[in-house]
Amino acid sequence: MAEEQNPSATFDTILTLDFGSQYTHLITRRLREIGVYSEMLPCTQKLADLPFKPKGIILSGGPYSVYEDGAPHADPAVFELGVPVLGICYGLQEIAYRLGKDNVVAGTAREYGHADLNAQRLDNQGHVDKLFAGLEEHVKVWMSHGDKLVKLPEGFHTIATTANSEYAGIAHETKPVYGIQFHPEVTHTPDGAKLLRNFAVDICGANPNWTMSKFVDQEILRIRKLVGETDHVLGAVSGGVDSTVAAKLMKEAIGDRFHAVLVNNGCMRLNECETVAETLNKHLGINLTVVDASKRFLDGLKGVTDPEKKRMFIGATFIDVFEEEAEKIEALAENSGAKVKWFLQGTLYPDVIESISFKGPSATIKTHHNVGALPKRMIEGQGMKLIEPLRELFKDEVRQLGRELGIAHELVMRHPFPGPGIAIRVLGEVTPERVDIARKADHIFISMIREAGLYDKISQAYAALDPSKAVGVMGDKRVYAEIIILRAVETTDCKLTLGIDGDFVLRYIISVMTARAFPFDNEFLSKCATRIINEVHGVSRVLYDISSKPPATIEME
């Protein structure tokens, strides 16, 4: 997305500068949840290079000590721009350290976990009391720091304390500059969203008008301007939420000049191709081509048992198949005097964040591309250009956008499905027969979850096929048949797992998203097992995986 066309060109924006915390992205998410648009950039960002002026700036937490050589520091222009500034944890220490090198020291006692915060009111002090306005005098907050502010910077008031932090909250006497030692962005700070709203709306004056209804209107206009009146766009779809929403958005913007391609790799869910074709083509009006390459994929998977080799083969073959179909579509377009100049990519904001997150003083910021999913002509620079209409959105915003575009609830709320499909849910060798068993068992399991009204309460659910077999008794005969493993999990993106990193600064490792097995009752699981064994030929046993993540992963391979 061209910078000048970012939502920041239209919506009041709070800029979050990332100092390396693994939950900086939650600041951005919480602000958007209250209707204020926010963008995250690395702390090395030079404000002079910004294409917009933020309404306010938030300095995130981080795993460093501000007084150490090589510690990251914000552009001095942050404090010269004339907009409100809020420092969180490391951000508080950054504000204090720049005003006095002895203001921050290594703490004698680390403070992490829940803490009782006492907010202090300073009457008749103008902006000073605004940060905690509407909050109780005593509130629960989440702390995770080792270093400590031991001196109040000149010109600041104390606005909050805890038993271990004399300066848990500070505010400048005359300027809207604030610092807090706790983390308002996590759910462990119950009133954190209120505090962030106080800062963004009441102190910064940001208009809380960030909605998907306004975004979709702006994005359609942007796409039309970018693509022009004659160029065509090509994109791969899978039936998943991201690709479906991106495809529908493109359809709304340029109509039949968007060409969607669905590749059947032989490892999709039961009736998936037919369902996706009906949804995208008939109901959403998307120009869709379905390529049945199932035999090509399954033949190539014979004898392959290593999960990574499965992924690599499926990924490489997908690119080959997609490329072949793309050439046909391009040829047809050229026959009518048009050209396919753009490739639709379903990049989301978390993908962008992963690329721009601050990883150290010498880290190189790279442009995010999911290279494994790009056609060769994109990699080799043969002319097609990327268009990424969802790259500024979080997953929950993509779902909201889907609803705004009229996509059915059942499709918008679909569980994630891995790119390699059932191939990585069939443990061991992938054969058509084994895929069929896993596919049918999965269909029964998901159908029963839907019938029980549990689907939207579960983050992901599926049936996998174990590489071993087990003895059973059917019709008074001994059988030696397949084992099905059922898995269903609840996940959260903001439940903190404590871990010490660097100078005892505690971080939550977002790449290890936590998940726990969904607590089905035994009667439900028993019914699932009975149906699968009775209806799927070749299955003698059904197990339920109760492992949490970590240490287990959500997928089997």
Curated annotation (Swiss-Prot):
Its main location: cytoplasm. It comes from the Eukaryota. It catalyses: XMP + L-glutamine + ATP + H2O = GMP + L-glutamate + AMP + diphosphate + 2 H(+). ATP binds at residues 238-244. It is found in: Cytoplasm, Cytosol. One of its GO terms (biological process) is GMP biosynthetic process. Coiled coil: none annotated. Residues 210-414 form the GMPS ATP-PPase domain. Its EC number is 6.3.5.2. GO terms for cellular component: cytosol. It holds the Pfam family GMP_synt_C. Inhibited by 6-diazo-5-oxo-l-norleucine (DON) and acivicin (ACI). Keywords: ATP-binding, Cytoplasm, Glutamine amidotransferase, GMP biosynthesis, Ligase, Magnesium, Nucleotide-binding, Purine biosynthesis. The active site is at residues 89, 183, 185. Catalyzes the conversion of xanthine monophosphate (XMP) to GMP in the presence of glutamine and ATP through an adenyl-XMP intermediate. Homodimer. This is GMP synthase [glutamine-hydrolyzing]. It comes from Aspergillus fumigatus (strain ATCC MYA-4609 / CBS 101355 / FGSC A1100 / Af293). The lineage of its organism: Eukaryota, Fungi, Dikarya, Ascomycota, Pezizomycotina.
